[in-house]
Amino acid sequence: MSRKRTENGSESGPATSHVPVDRFGFLKQEHANSPERFSKSKTTSSTDHDREERKVRKWRKMIGVGGSDWKHYVRRKPNVVRRRIRKGIPDCLRGLVWQLISGSRDLLLMNPGVYEQLVIYETSASELDIIRDISRTFPSHVFFQKRHGPGQRSLYNVLKAYSVYDRDVGYVQGMGFIAGLLLLYMSEEDAFWLLVALLKGAVHAPMEGLYHAGLPLVQQYLFQLESLVKELIPKLGEHFTQEMINPSMYASQWFITVFSYSFPFPLALRIWDVFLSEVKLPFEKLIHALKTFPEDAMNPDTLLPLAYSIKVSKRLEELTLEYQKTNAKPVQP
Amino acid sequence: MAGYRADEEYDYLFKLVLIGDSGVGKSNLLSRFTKNEFNLESKSTIGVEFATKTTKVEGKVVKAQIWDTAGQERYRAITSAYYRGAVGALLIYDVTRHATFENAARWLRELRGHTDPNIVVMLIGNKCDLRHLVAVKTEEAKAFAERESLYFMETSALDATNVENAFTEVLTQIHKIVSKRSVDGGGESADLPGKGETINVKEDGSVLKRMGCCSN
């Protein structure tokens, strides 16, 4: 199910044969999203390799065959699972684990044949809009680069299926980056159900408010971020106010695409690991990144551990309520 | 904002917005003007982006702060906030897609609902390099522009046709309004526009005068 990815760019990519790509499949000459600057292990030593192997073995044991032991393990040792996820899910198991922790695997099993039906038989009012954005989604990734290639076709199918599945939301620019990220780790049908789990809420609160008319959830997150910056980094908050920088200028695209649009790819992946399991957006990380910017702010191994030390959960809940109170139309629960 | 210098020297700061349907080439027009770059494989714009370019207009140093907005209808909730304080706008359509031209009227209404009546607006037919695919006749667009008192140009971000001209023309027209205002002796403040403030090109704050070098 999971696609083979190239290691360190030395082997050939799936779509084009002699283009140098990084270990995630992005073209090397592209600087946007390129993890080069941020990945520590440029030359993987044998001890690193051993450590990685051990980590994968532990994870396999925890998951069981095809995910059979997962639920049991999570129930018995939630803290171990949480700690391991925070350290980063091994890349080779990421797709499967994401499906397990988001609850999308269950949705898939409960709805056999539904995805195929949506793709093949239904038509969507958003088809032209989707097509217009297909070649503009991760254009520097080998999988999505080829016009009408398998990557672009899968992306189209998932987005079209979703726009039919939820006609209120339809298609909104930005969803493509989420679907694209998922498609690098799982099949079309799996990616579709993960998108459903995320937006409709399988094990956690639905996030479809990101894409509803008026973008209510985006507005709420922007409000929360602005409040947190003012409270936790007052000097920066003051500076932003003076220069009339409001968070919609720099953070709209972070929220609309759940960090998949412009963050360095390895960081986006680590954020997704935690985001899917802990069911909340990484406001701690944003605050921390804004605090330490620019040194090291985008290196996942530096940013994430430090970010966990910043406690914002309680304040976030209060701000959610505050936002909903001051806005006539509350965010859909 | 690393390396930002508050004392960067310019006479005026003009805020412009780029609006128009998704995929008409707003981001590429912006990168062609500010960086002389064009990218055939660019990402869709999500939310807003901005870039600046400092240029000379009628002997004055003008810094253009240009906001590039996502074109999809659903984004209006976020992007319309960026109209506030704009003194110029480029309303862009794609000459190969007639629907994007038909939507220009709606974009214009939307823009006028959020900005000062004196805002300088230029209608732009982009992608004019695709001659064999043209679906919007120059005459048709020109007539619309005249009816709505807009400036008009056809451009190609790909081969750079008229891109510099279009932006320069808009900046020049804004400067004309501003300097006329100066001669008239209208009072102006040197502040950036505040939140929620209505910007008037005649007595605005967003048309920034710097260093007092041209106030009289």
Swiss-Prot record, chain B:
- Main localization of the protein? membrane
Going by the UniProt record, its keywords in alphabetical order are: Cell membrane, GTP-binding, Lipoprotein, Membrane, Nucleotide-binding, Prenylation, Protein transport, Transport
InterPro entries according to UniProt: P-loop_NTPase, Rab_GTPases_membrane_traffic, Small_GTP-bd, Small_GTPase
Residue span of motif Effector region:
42-50
Question: Topology with regard to the membrane?
Answer: Lipid-anchor
**DNA-binding as a keyword?**
no
* Free-text disruption phenotype from the record: Slight increase of primary root elongation and lateral root branching and hypersensitivity of root growth in response to exogenous auxin.
- Entry's SUPFAM superfamilies? P-loop containing nucleoside triphosphate hydrolases (SSF52540)
State any GO BP term from the record.
cell wall biogenesis
Any one annotated GO CC term: cytosol
What GO annotations for molecular function exist for this entry?
GTP binding; GTPase activity
Cellular compartments annotated? Cell membrane
Q: What induces it?
A: By auxin.
Described purpose of this protein according to its UniProt entry:
Involved in auxin-mediated response. May be involved in vesicle trafficking of components involved in polar auxin transport. Binds GTP and GDP and possesses intrinsic GTPase activity.
Instruction: Describe the family membership recorded for this protein in Swiss-Prot or TrEMBL.
Output: Belongs to the small GTPase superfamily. Rab family.
NCBIfam families (UniProt xref)? small_GTP
**Other noteworthy facts:** Plants overexpressing RABA1A show reduced growth of roots and shoots and smaller leaf sizes.
Any idea what this protein is called? Answer: Ras-related protein RABA1a
Annotated organism of origin: Arabidopsis thaliana
The organism's lineage? Answer: Eukaryota, Viridiplantae, Streptophyta, Embryophyta, Tracheophyta
